[in-house]
């Protein structure tokens, strides 16, 4: 079978956005997982920012990974991927000019689409970790991203957090990003279908949801009718890999009979030590969770 080019995969992603169906992403974090996801028939994969931080730095999701580190991992995946890969580009690694550099590098890496979010990252002195940038700044980032891409088939997706503002404020933000030219709108923190319907009724571009398997949003047909085309349930495959590594090495060391049997979430917490970063952020930056 002939290998699909990066542009082929970008067109394939756009076909997903233009369809009438809802697709769930595979968590793709290295070349092997990309090949497995494609072989199993997944229509789209995602390289999550949090997963990249874990894979590259063994660090929690505190915007610690650099653009070059993220792009290197995306490039490794892009060499072999035969499914469209969506890159979670966080805040674009800086201001609107940094966003342009991010788009240039990720386009060269071969991703089919990328999200740029309006969270105030990295955490700022004296601010909450969930604060968002002004909508005007977010619009500037989306416009800059569109200007920077060379291949117009690369999808630029604006992401915002529906869990930290009122529904009315989220509607204003998403409409602004749509007007700026975003190919799709991604939202995290949508509570239920009632909230989603209120927001979706004001938008015409395709939607992407990061649900983390929210049981209140478990209806693909209803999601599709509301314009949702991409759903990110989380990154279970990556955490399963952590658990499998731990269990295998534990068995190899003859420790399988010990009472300790940590879950994947507990293992991630143990080996990334997020409480240290939270303490440092409070001590040195007065950051409020």
From Swiss-Prot:
GO BP annotation list: oxaloacetate metabolic process; propionate catabolic process, 2-methylcitrate cycle; pyruvate biosynthetic process
Class in the EC hierarchy, top level: lyase
A UniProt-annotated Pfam family: PEP_mutase
InterPro entries on file: ICL/PEPM (IPR039556), Oxaloacetate_deCOase_bac (IPR023687), Pyrv/PenolPyrv_kinase-like_dom (IPR015813), Pyrv_kinase-like_dom_sf (IPR040442)
Binding site for substrate: 50, 159, 235
UniProtKB keywords: Decarboxylase, Lyase, Magnesium, Metal-binding
Reaction equation(s) it catalyzes: oxaloacetate + H(+) = pyruvate + CO2
Record text on cofactor binding: Binds 1 Mg(2+) ion per subunit.
GO MF annotations in UniProt: magnesium ion binding; methylisocitrate lyase activity; oxaloacetate decarboxylase activity
Signal sequence residues: none
Cofactor: Mg(2+)
E.C. numbers: 4.1.1.112
Domain of life, per lineage: Bacteria
Residues the entry annotates as binding Mg(2+): 88
Subunit structure of this chain's protein: Homotetramer; dimer of dimers.
Protein function: Catalyzes the decarboxylation of oxaloacetate into pyruvate. Seems to play a role in maintaining cellular concentrations of bicarbonate and pyruvate.
Family per similarity comment: Belongs to the isocitrate lyase/PEP mutase superfamily. Oxaloacetate decarboxylase family.
UniProt protein name: Oxaloacetate decarboxylase 1
Organism name: Pseudomonas putida (strain W619)
Organism phylogeny: Bacteria, Pseudomonadati, Pseudomonadota, Gammaproteobacteria, Pseudomonadales
